[in-house]
C-alpha cells in the first residue's frame, strides 16, 4: 500500500504486545515462530507495514508462561490485537484463573491490574500471587460475581478459561462486573457446550459442524446480553483430551457473528 506506515519487525512485535522487548522479539524470530502475511520471518530488521498480519505461533515446550494455558491466550491476542484489541493499561478479570496462564499473559502485555478469580484455592502460581498488580479471589464462583466481589471496581477487559460449565451461564455475571465498552475474550470449549450425549470417544467433539454450533450458541447468548462479536479464532493448542477450542472477542454493540469468520477459524485451527 503506497504510503503505508512501516516499522522494524522487532519493534512492531513489541508495539503489538506480541513480544516483551526487542531482544525477546529477536528470539521469537530466530525460533521461526513469527510469520508476516503467512510467511516465516527471518530478520528482526525487516520493515513491515503496521497493518501487516503478524502472528507469533505458540510453543508448547516454551517454559516462559506459568502454564500451558498462557500459550492459548497469547495466540488469541496475536489474532485480535492487530484488529484493535487493547490490553495495555487496562483493569482485567481472569475468570477461571487456575495456575494463572492467562493472568501471566495479560501482565506481560501491559495490563494495569488483573483480578484472578477461581472456585479453587491456592492454585495461582506464587510469582503471580506475590505480584502487586494481581488481586487473588480464590473460592469464588464466577456465576456469582458482583462488583462487591471484585472490590467495587468494574473491569474493562475480561478473559476466561472455564471448564464443566456452558459459557452462557456465566456471561451475565461477567457483563455485570464489566465497565461500558469492556472487551471480553473468552474461550469456547465445545465439549461443555454441545451436551454429553453428543461427545465422541474420550469426550472429544470431533465434528467441525458441532464445534461451529458451540461457538454460535455462545455468540447467540452474548447477543441476548447486548454483546456482539469482533473476532473469532481457534486456540493454537488443543485441550488436554484433544478438543479444539475457540476464542470469541465480544463487546457491547458489536456486530453479529460472521459465519465466514467462523468457517475460517474452524478451517485454520487444529483438526
Feature annotation, model-predicted:
Residues 1-52, 91:
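A basic, amphipathic helix-loop patch mediating RNA/tRNA/ribosome contacts
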Residues 86-98:
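Conserved class I S-adenosyl-L-methionine
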Residues 100-101, 122:
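Glycine-rich SAM-binding Motif I of class I
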Residues 105-113:
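Conserved S-adenosyl-L-methionine
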Residues 115-165, 169:
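S-adenosyl-L-methionine
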Residues 168-185:
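A short glycine-rich, Lys/Arg-flanked "PGG" loop and its adjoining helix->strand segment in the class I
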Residues 190-207:
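Short, glycine-/aromatic-enriched active-site segment of Class I SAM-dependent methyltransferases
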Residues 244, 249-271:
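Flexible, glycine-/basic-rich loop-and-beta segments that form/coincide
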Amino acid at each position: 500500500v503506497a504510503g503505508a506506515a512501516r516499522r522494524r519487525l522487532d519493534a512492531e512485535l513489541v508495539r503489538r504486545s506480541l513480544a516483551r522487548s526487542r531482544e525477546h522479539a529477536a528470539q521469537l524470530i530466530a525460533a521461526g515462530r513469527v510469520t508476516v502475511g503467512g510467511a516465516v520471518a527471518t530478520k528482526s530488521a525487516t520493515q513491515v507495514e503496521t497493518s501487516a498480519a503478524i502472528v507469533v505461533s505458540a510453543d508448547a515446550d516454551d517454559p516462559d508462561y506459568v502454564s500451558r494455558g498462557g500459550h492459548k491466550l497469547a495466540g488469541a491476542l496475536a489474532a485480535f490485537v492487530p484488529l484493535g484489541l487493547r490490553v495495555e493499561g487496562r483493569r482485567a478479570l481472569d475468570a477461571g484463573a487456575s495456575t494463572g496462564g492467562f493472568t501471566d499473559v495479560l501482565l506481560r502485555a501491559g495490563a494495569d491490574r488483573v483480578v484472578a478469580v477461581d472456585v479453587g484455592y491456592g492454585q495461582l502460581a506464587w510469582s503471580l500471587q506475590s505480584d502487586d498488580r494481581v488481586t487473588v479471589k480464590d473460592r469464588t464462583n464466577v456465576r456469582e460475581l458482583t462488583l462487591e466481589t471484585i472490590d467495587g471496581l468494574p473491569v474493562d477487559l475480561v478473559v476466561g478459561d472455564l471448564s464443566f460449565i456452558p459459557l452462557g451461564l456465566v456471561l451475565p455475571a461477567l457483563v455485570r462486573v464489566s465497565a461500558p465498552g469492556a472487551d471480553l475474550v473468552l474461550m469456547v470449549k465445545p465439549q461443555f457446550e454441545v451436551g454429553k450425549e453428543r461427545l465422541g470417544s474420550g469426550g472429544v467433539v470431533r465434528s467441525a459442524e458441532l464445534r461451529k454450533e458451540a461457538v454460535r450458541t455462545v455468540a447467540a447468548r452474548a447477543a441476548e446480553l447486548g454483546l456482539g462479536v469482533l473476532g473469532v479464532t481457534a486456540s493454537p493448542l488443543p485441550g488436554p483430551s484433544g478438543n479444539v477450542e475457540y476464542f470469541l472477542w465480544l463487546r457491547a454493540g458489536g456486530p453479529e457473528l460472521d459465519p465466514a469468520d467462523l468457517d475460517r477459524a474452524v478451517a485454520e485451527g487444529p483438526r
